[in-house]
Amino acid sequence: MEVNKKQLADIFGASIRTIQNWQEQGMPVLRGGGKGNEVLYDSAAVIRWYAERDAEIENEKLRREVEELRQASETDLQPGTIEYERHRLTRAQADAQELKNARDSAEVVETAFCTFVLSRIAGEIASILDGIPLSVQRRFPELENRHVDFLKRDIIKAMNKAAALDELIPGLLSEYNRADRQYAGGSRS
């Protein structure tokens, strides 16, 4: 939606001066500006810019706090002290923010989502596989029933494997994590 400076200020509950400051900081302008021309903004683009800017500011604050705490060496911190607990909390917040950013940018996804998607795809594949014996029988009527039955048996095995995918994913994830930890642990070539 196209909005002018006043409308944008109303959307954000900010002053027109704040909008001008944001524009100087890189907020996207749709068109206008200059001598006597009203500046227009795409509200969706501005909201996206604002959210990204807000996340960057928050990340920078957390990074600074983590760096300050790292400077006060971790070994100097005593468990149970306020400094120690603050350090733990700040690190946890920084880790959580990094994970959230990775999730928002689709660098990581939830295991439940992967399970859902792969199970859905496996179901569609199973449906296609189910029709193959009949298609083969119609296309090649000269085939004996034993040939079609052989094909059906192997297809049923594949369909069962696909149907069990949602049950296999947690085990495969554990196997992947073990292999990844071994790789990260120093067995790199």
Swiss-Prot record:
The name under which this protein is listed is: Prophage DNA-packing protein NohA
* Pfam families in the cross-refs: Phage_Nu1 (PF07471)
Q: Which domain of life is it from?
A: Bacteria
What further note is attached to this protein's record?
Answer: Encoded in the Qin prophage.
Per the entry, induction is:
Regulated by the Fur protein.
Q: Which family does it belong to?
A: Belongs to the terminase small subunit family.
* Gene responsible for this protein: nohA
Name the lineage.
Answer: Bacteria, Pseudomonadati, Pseudomonadota, Gammaproteobacteria, Enterobacterales
